[in-house]
């Protein structure tokens, strides 16, 4: 099973982002700077909707990535960050077992775009907001077979959408120093990935 949960915040002021996150998430009690890349390997699920463990880094000159341990859309958090920091916030989530993919863009306190699909059940796609200039008629990659046209919105689509905003969805964590925000009661149990045949974030 593979799960991906992340926020991307357009900012060059990482310290201001850290303070905004700490203010918005009362369960966060400790901030630890200059953590190595392998800190990103321990993102275990939170027991409640709000994350209580986050790691962030300035992985792009204009964008910070925040990995967190909540499989929640975090609408209030993303909207609040985009408003308080007067910027854009992108939320991405994916889950391989349920074949679930999520993308949302918040800008200056407004939800501008939201896409949500789950191919393992019959729920309808969420597709709200103005279509981006780079999108097809429907979100995702256009496929044609036997005269039939369909669209697949998956992990590759999430990566491509992020690139359109000027950053890579994934960068090698070992290339950066990370800031850890967590609840002091969080039980740390790092994963042993030395023998993994693929990166921790790739779930197929």
Where are these regions (language model features)?
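Short, low-complexity intrinsically disordered segments
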Residues: 2, 61, 91, 176, ...
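Exposed alpha-helical structural elements
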Residues: 16, 73-80, 157-160
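Intrinsic-disorder-associated interaction segments
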Residues: 10, 14, 74, 151-154
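Long, compositionally biased intrinsically disordered terminal regions
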Residues: 113-200, 204
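Short, intrinsically disordered low-complexity segments
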Residues: 27-118
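Extended non-membrane alpha-helical scaffolds
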Residues: 18-24, 35-46, 173, 177-180, ...
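Short, extreme N-terminal segment that most often corresponds to the first beta-strand
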Residues: 1-29, 202-203
């Amino acid at each position: 099973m593979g799960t991906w949960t992340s926020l991307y915040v357009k900012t060059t002021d990482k310290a201001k982002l850290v303070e905004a996150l700490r203010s918005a998430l009362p369960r966060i009690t400790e901030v630890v700077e200059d953590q190595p890349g392998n800190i990103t390997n321990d993102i275990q699920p939170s027991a409640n909707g709000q994350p209580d463990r986050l790691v962030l880094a300035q992985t792009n000159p204009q964008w910070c990535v925040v990995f967190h341990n909540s499989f929640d859309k975090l609408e209030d958090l993303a909207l609040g960050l985009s408003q308080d920091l007067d910027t854009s916030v992108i939320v991405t989530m994916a889950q391989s077992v349920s074949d679930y993919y999520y993308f949302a863009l918040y800008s200056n306190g407004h939800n501008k775009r939201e896409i949500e699909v789950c191919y393992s059940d019959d729920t309808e796609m969420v597709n709200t907001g103005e279509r981006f200039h780079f999108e097809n008629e429907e979100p995702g990659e256009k496929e044609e077979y036997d005269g039939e046209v369909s669209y697949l919105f998956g992990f590759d689509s999430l990566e491509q959408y992020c690139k359109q905003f000027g950053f890579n969805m994934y960068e090698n964590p070992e290339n950066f120093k990370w800031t850890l925000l967590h609840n002091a009661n969080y039980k740390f149990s790092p994963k042993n990935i030395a023998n993994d045949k693929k990166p921790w974030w790739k779930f197929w």
